[in-house]
Amino acid sequence: MRILVVSNLYPPVAFGGYEVECSGVVERLRERNDVLVLTSDEHGRSTPAQPGVRRELVRLSHDARGARRAPLASLRAVASARRALAWGAELIYVWNGSSIPQAALRVLADSDVPLAFRICEHWFGGIFLNDQFMRELLPASRPPARAAWAAGCRALNSLPSLRLDPGAPMRTAISWNSAAIRSMVRVQPFIEPVLERVGHSVPRYGDLYAAVVREPAPEPEIVFLGRVTLYKGLWVAIEALALLRSEYGIQARLVVVGPEDADHGADMRDLAERLGVGEAISWRGQATPEQAAAALARAHALIVSSEWDEPFPLVTIEGALARVPLVASDVGGIGEGMHDEEHALLFPRGDTGAAAAALVRVLREEQQTTARVERAFERAQAFRLGPYLDEQERFVVDALAALTSEPLTSA
């Protein structure tokens, strides 16, 4: 089978674990199929050319600059999509359509090629309608300047090479990465899912984390493993650390492992200094999986303090495989993967006091913590790479079968 995979990013260019997950699925599919990847040109000139990967789509920022670039980027994206269709795909599998011109996805959806989606994030709820170009094609009350811009977008869309309809009907198959994201995303009425499945995401390097030999640091060490950006809630971990030291007399340290959004990283350092814990925090920056595993080997706890509704964060599974006690926000799909009290201690979103109290329990209730860690390790076995890749392979085959069957019609 010839499969066209579309994603906003593709390794070695990656923002998080989902892009790495995508590349694992592509590698598996290539064992029995021809696969072409269409992705963004992010870091395109510095990224080595890869067989079967086209880095052609413009990656758009979610701001005024991105909106200004969107019309011409959409024109280019449509041309890229049509070139990809000329390759002769028998199935299109869209992995992540966020931050790329969704005009490309609209062209693919309007073709006769069966179309499936892997949904790991919230973007699918606003597909086409929130796109920075196609949203201007919809009727709406706009201020004068915005109305003029929308008129220009509609004029561009009148070109024979475009003529896109954001709300045109679309039959598809959907693989959701958690029941949580399935419940959080509203599927637009013009979309007809003919097949839906929940297939939980899994860590690409699960075996590496499962092989971690625990050597906890002499003093309590808490690890935050993730991007230093607003929605990941590092401030919760920093304030919880301050409470551990000031209210509970626990001289813990916080190890921050992950790439930083520069401005937010500076804000977090300022917060740590104001709270008097600046010297108790180590900033490790971007890490390889091996370096992350080494940090987990020393950790007394892993804190996942996200403020947004994480669909299914892989870091919780990685920590469980490494046998590190988990303290996490009760948001999105976190509790779907690791159940409260049974596998982890969950706290309400943004509640620094509850986060600190959960960390105290982990550090002081040795027997309960040990038992919880063992249960979490067993739970994490449900999220291993081999069975997941088998499941994705079955989904692709079943999606093609469902989408090529005749649609039901009313009598």
Model-found features: residue ranges?
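Glycosyltransferase donor-sugar binding loop
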Residues: 225, 253-267
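Nucleotide-activated donor-binding/catalytic signature segment of Leloir-type glycosyltransferases, i.e.
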Residues: 266-287
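A structural motif in glycosyltransferase catalytic domains
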Residues: 22, 29, 222, 237-241, ...
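Conserved acidic donor-binding segment of nucleotide-sugar-dependent glycosyltransferases
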Residues: 340-341, 345-352, 361-367
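A conserved mid-protein helix/loop that constitutes part of the nucleotide-sugar donor-binding site
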Residues: 20, 220, 229-245, 266, ...
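N-terminal subdomain of nucleotide-sugar transferases
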Residues: 1-45, 87, 111-113
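N-terminal strand-loop element at the rim of the active site
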Residues: 10, 32-72, 259
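Acidic donor-binding loop of glycosyltransferase active sites
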Residues: 297-311, 324
